[in-house]
Curated annotation (Swiss-Prot):
The keyword Oxidoreductase does not apply. It is a multi-pass membrane protein. The chain crosses the membrane at residues 16-36, 347-367, 369-389, 396-416, 440-460, 472-492, 537-557, 863-883, 888-908, 911-931, 968-988, 998-1018. Induction: The mdtABC operon is transcriptionally activated by BaeR. One of its GO terms (molecular function) is xenobiotic transmembrane transporter activity. One of its GO terms (cellular component) is plasma membrane. The MdtABC tripartite complex confers resistance against novobiocin and deoxycholate. It is found in: Cell inner membrane. Keywords: Cell inner membrane, Cell membrane, Membrane, Transmembrane, Transmembrane helix, Transport. This is Multidrug resistance protein MdtB. Part of a tripartite efflux system composed of MdtA, MdtB and MdtC. MdtB forms a heteromultimer with MdtC.
Length: 1040
């Protein structure tokens, strides 16, 4: 019969050791809660950390960029600028379109921001042009966020106008109603319309003007209330034939009489069914199409939104004619799922490797089963907490769990190893479990809370980076806490039931061989440690050297922000000369498409020409290149981009700018390349002076590539210089001149055709086929006060000038954005420093301000806070350790292990050619928590030996190092193997995971080798310092 130890032994573990059924059921409950939580958790690429962003679009066909800025954008900006919680406001005013992007503070709910935007639009309504065809429309979407899904709609039998009409009414509206969808954009949208193309010569010959025609059309097509008749016995609603629905009806419209004979619209104009805007076009591969881009709302889950769309698509396509084909060209969730699947596989690999290393050290199947149960239980239990915290299964939380594999097994290893040591000494399993668990309990608590202390500063990181890593830090902390609970409850209980002297002594050939190997390693370590303790100052100099080396490596290592991911989608901008027309740009775009589609890595291509919410001018085109899956192509995205740019360089007259889409989008506007730098001034004249000078210098920097600017001030303008005196004598106002020009050349929307399903426009313009270019202005006629017809040329001169193709604002002031990429042999930190140095050489005036934007600005912010973040982690851990050990000295001994980890991590990153980015920095912070475990295990046992066995400090630390050598080696290798799958990852999203693994593996290897020798030396030096300090105080007291 087994004699139980006294009830004072076992500590907090005693209750669970003595009640195995209750402990087992408790663990089953944790397991079930975790499984249920896993099934309930949403899946995403990264934590949802989007800024609340709203885009406001206003269309005013025919308006110049200058008119759009002053008449539409500026009044709206003044109202938006008064909203609380607004972080940044940017706008782009181009020909016929104003796009304002409003980015709010992270703390402001999107719904609240939406209400403020609507109120601001309402307040600005009276300030906007009275002939604005439609009021401003807002969407809860970030325009820089790539579409979650792109669909192409084509037809072999129907014109694009009919296809667009069906897609808009039957498909796009339904998709827009799906939860999480922020905006559905129809690129190349050929909306049906009745186009009236006036024959200038015909109306002039009849003494008519375009304004006469416009007035006749608007008066003939109305749709207003008419009332009803309410008699004694019945009510009658009034109706009339006041609507004209077809081109034929408009063709027969009488617009005037001459000599008693009617003049019909068809006599002076070509009237046809056409497109509302003839300067829009989109293509899927080489076929003209309606391209439907679906963007999510900020904060919406991509996976669930895309799944809802795919579930609805079959039902929607069934309502379309058979000649209409809907093709899904890209779906970002495909790569997101693949990335998450790869990370989950790496998590399983980490668990398998950790269990393998445990068996290698323990050489005992029962002893291996215990942590083999504890590790998955700790990780699975974390899912239950993640549900309550509203987290998701994403790359960062899965990376946290993968790293946690090496952490959580440490607690189990420490407990098992200590209990096994007592069983091998002859203790009964139950007594050994109670004694071993009680002895190691404080160490487990110290390890747990000191490691969590390292993660605390991550929770206080500001802005979007802090939000991004909050889920990572909390997930890891929860896994560590659950591991500590499991290690103090389930693990000792299983040890008491599964371990025995017979099982621990049972050895096979492998066990005996490995035991001899470990004995030789420990003996060699003991001899080496004895020599090191005899030369403390030499060892201390090595420790100080690692500190100095870590600082030097930190200064010189290339620095970045976020790893560039290969998500299989490339966004592109095609740029042509500023005077390019729509037809010219469409032709150039098709030439480029032919080149791109020949690349073996390209699966499909969508392209768009025209002015809309993301494309500012007719001389640019927008591209989306969808690559084949990663396992079906030989090269990663950066090599594909380089190859495509080289191929397109052979196409004359165009510049192509490409960038891979990323899961993390911080920018608020679609840019040509990955990084942005802005110049802001109080006037456009100041920008026109300084932008070319800065561009010239930046294009010469080797640290930058693909440098471009959105400053386009060479757009051709035909300036109509009216002689106001002559016009006034004839009774012609400037409003008459503007109306005549707008009627002729503005694709003016003059009337609306109402149907049961949609509304369509009547478009008025001059037929300029026979009078191209500036000659068309000679055909303009105006009506004088006496009813005569006056040629525009008689009161005005035409001057050719240059003007901006688009006018951009940032927080209401003119701005230009310079975009750039970083070559492979340089880092983002190099590029940022080069730009800052170049800016200083220009001596910019005080009214010019510069600032990095988007991810570059976030990089600067993260880089500035990194050192403080690490310092905060060290201070937090010092405070926790000081509280736990009730000592000012021992925490310093433990923290002395940190420089070795930093040296190892930085060296590994440099050897691997990886930048010190945000992911790598998180790895270094985690190393701070890992490597101090070695010192904690040594110091705990040394202090116990001094206190309980009366050993000298040197004997105590020497014995502690030898006794704890095996668990130290086991825990370090477990942590290393937990990070190894991340370091070796090659699948989708590997770019995101690899820096974390590289830094941790490098840091663990170097720290493992050095801290086994430096920690005991520093422990003894601080012990001598403490004795010297005490003796000095004692001497002063005696003298007093």
């Amino acid at each position: 019969m087994q004699v139980l130890p006294p009830s004072s032994t076992g500590g907090p573990s005693r209750l669970f050791i003595m009640r195995p059924v209750a402990t087992t059921l408790l663990m089953v409950a944790i397991l079930l809660a975790g499984i249920i939580g896993y099934r309930a958790l949403p899946v995403s690429a990264l934590p949802e950390v989007d800024y609340p962003t709203i885009q406001v679009v206003t269309l005013y066909p025919g308006a110049s960029p200058d008119v759009m800025t002053s008449a539409v954008t500026a009044p709206l900006e003044r109202q938006f600028g008064q909203m609380s919680g607004l972080k940044q406001m940017s706008s782009q005013s181009s020909g016929g379109a104003s796009v304002i992007t409003l980015q709010f503070q992270l703390t402001l709910p999107l719904d609240v921001a939406e209400q403020e935007v609507q109120a601001a639009i309402n307040a600005a309504t009276n300030l906007l042009p009275s002939d604005l065809p439609n009021p401003p429309v807002y969407s809860k979407v970030n325009p820089a966020d790539p579409p979650i899904m792109t669909l192409a709609v084509t037809s072999t039998a129907m014109p694009m106008t009919q296809v667009e009409d069906m897609v808009e009414t039957r498909v796009a509206q339904k998709i827009s109603q799906i939860s999480g969808v922020g905006l559905v954009t129809l690129s190349g949208g050929q909306r049906p319309a009745v186009r009236v193309k006036l024959n200038a010569q015909a109306i002039a010959a009849l003494g008519l003007t375009s304004e006469t025609v416009r007035t006749a059309i608007t008066g003939a097509n109305v749709n207003s209330a008419k009332g009803s008749l309410d008699g004694p016995s019945r009510a009658v609603t009034l109706s009339a034939n006041d609507q004209m629905q077809s081109a034929e009806e408009y063709r027969q419209l009488i617009i005037a009489y001459q000599n008693g004979a009617p003049i019909r619209l068809g006599d002076v104009a070509t009237v046809e069914q056409g497109a509302e805007n003839s300067w829009l076009g989109a293509w899927a591969n080489k076929e003209q199409a309606i391209v439907m881009n679906v963007q999510r709302q900020p904060g919406a889950n991509i996976i669930s939104t895309a799944d809802s769309i795919r579930q609805m698509l079959p039902q929607l396509t069934e309502s379309l004619p058979k000649s209409v084909k809907v093709t899904v060209l890209s779906d970002r969730t495909t790569n997101i799922r693949a990335s998450v699947d790869d990370t989950q596989f790496e998590l399983m690999m980490a668990i398998a490797l950790v269990v393998m290393i445990i068996y290698l050290f323990l050489r005992n199947i029962p002893a291996t089963i215990i942590p083999g149960v504890a590790v998955p239980l700790s990780l699975i239990g974390t899912f239950a907490v993640m549900v309550f915290l509203d987290f998701s299964i994403n790359n960062l939380t899965l990376m946290a769990l993968t790293i946690a594999t090496g952490f959580v097994v440490d607690d189990a290893i420490v407990v098992i190893e200590n209990i096994s040591r007592y069983i091998e000494k002859g203790e009964k399993p139950l007594a050994a479990a109670l004694k071993g668990a009680g002895e190691i309990g404080f160490t487990i608590i110290s390890l747990t809370f000191s490691l969590i202390a390292v993660l605390i500063p991550l929770l206080f990181m500001g802005d979007i980076v802090g939000r991004l890593f909050r889920e990572f830090a909390i997930t890891l902390a929860v896994a560590i806490l659950i591991s500590a609970v499991v290690s103090l409850t389930l693990t000792p209980m299983m040890c008491a039931r599964m371990l025995s002297q017979e099982s621990l002594r049972k050895q096979n050939r492998f066990s005996r061989a490995s035991e001899k190997m470990f004995d030789r390693i420990i003996a060699a370590y003991g001899r080496g440690l004895a020599k090191v303790l005899n030369h403390p100052w030499l060892t201390l100099s090595v420790a100080l050297s690692t500190l100095l080396l870590s600082v030097l490596l930190w200064v010189f290592i290339p620095k970045g922000f976020f790893p560039v991911q290969d998500n299989g989608i490339i966004q592109g901008t095609l740029q042509a000369p500023q005077s390019s027309s729509f037809a010219n740009m469409a032709q150039r775009q098709r030439q480029v498409a032919d080149v791109i589609l020949q690349d073996p890595a390209v699966q499909s291509l969508t392209s768009f020409v025209g002015v809309d919410g993301t494309n500012p001018s007719l001389n640019s085109a927008r591209l989306q290149i969808n690559l084949k899956p990663l396992d079906e192509r030989d090269d990663r995205v950066q090599k594909v981009i380089a190859r495509l740019q080289t191929a397109v360089d052979k196409v004359p007259g165009v510049d192509l700018f490409l960038q891979p889409t990323q899961d993390l989008t911080i920018d608020t506007q679609v840019s040509r390349t990955q990084y942005q730098f802005t110049l802001q001034a109080t006037s456009l004249d100041a920008l026109s002076t300084w932008v070319p000078q800065l561009m010239e210098k930046l294009q010469q920097l080797p640290q930058l590539s693909d440098v471009s600017s959105d400053w386009q001030d060479k757009g051709l303008v035909a300036y109509v210089n009216v002689d106001r005196d002559s016009a006034s004598r004839l009774g012609i106002s400037m409003a008459d001149v503007d109306n005549a020009l707008y009627n002729a050349f503005g694709q003016r929307l003059i009337s609306t055709i109402y149907t049961q399903a949609n509304q369509y426009r009547v478009v008025l313009e001059h037929n300029t086929e026979n009078t191209p270019g500036l000659a068309a202005l000679d055909t303009i006629r105006l009506t004088s006060s006496d009813g005569g017809v006056v040629p525009l040329s008689s009161i005005a001169k035409i001057e050719q000038r240059f003007a901006p193709l688009s006018i951009n604002h940032l927080d209401q002031f003119p701005v230009t954005t310079i975009s750039f990429n970083v070559p492979d042999n340089y880092s983002l930190g190099d590029a940022v420093q080069a730009i800052m140095d170049t800016e200083k050489t220009l001596n910019l005036p005080v009214d010019i301000t510069t600032q990095f934007q988007g991810s570059t600005l976030a990089f600067q912010s993260a880089l500035g806070s990194t050192v403080w973040l690490i310092v905060a982690a060290v201070v937090a851990m010092y405070i926790v350790l000081g509280i736990l050990y009730e000592s000012f000295i021992h925490p310093i001994t433990i923290l002395s292990t940190l420089p070795t980890a930093g040296v190892g991590a930085l060296l590994a990153l440099m050897i691997a050619g990886s930048e010190l980015d945000v992911i790598a920095i998180i790895g270094i912070i985690l190393l701070i928590g890992i490597v101090k475990k070695n010192a904690i295990m040594m110091i705990d046992f040394a202090l116990a030996a001094e206190r309980e066995q009366g050993m000298s400090p040197r004997e105590a630390i020497y014995q502690a190092c030898l006794l704890r050598f095996r668990p130290i080696l086991m825990t370090t290798l477990a942590a290393l193997l937990g990070a190894l799958p991340l370091m070796l990852s090659t699948g989708v999203g590997a770019e995101l995971r690899r820096p974390l693994g590289i830094g941790m593996v490098g840091g663990l290897i170097v720290s493992q080798v050095l801290t086994l020798f430096t920690t005991p030396v520093i422990y003894l030096l601080f012990d001598r310092l403490a004795l010297w300090t005490k003796s000095r105080f004692a001497r002063h007291e005696e003298e007093a």
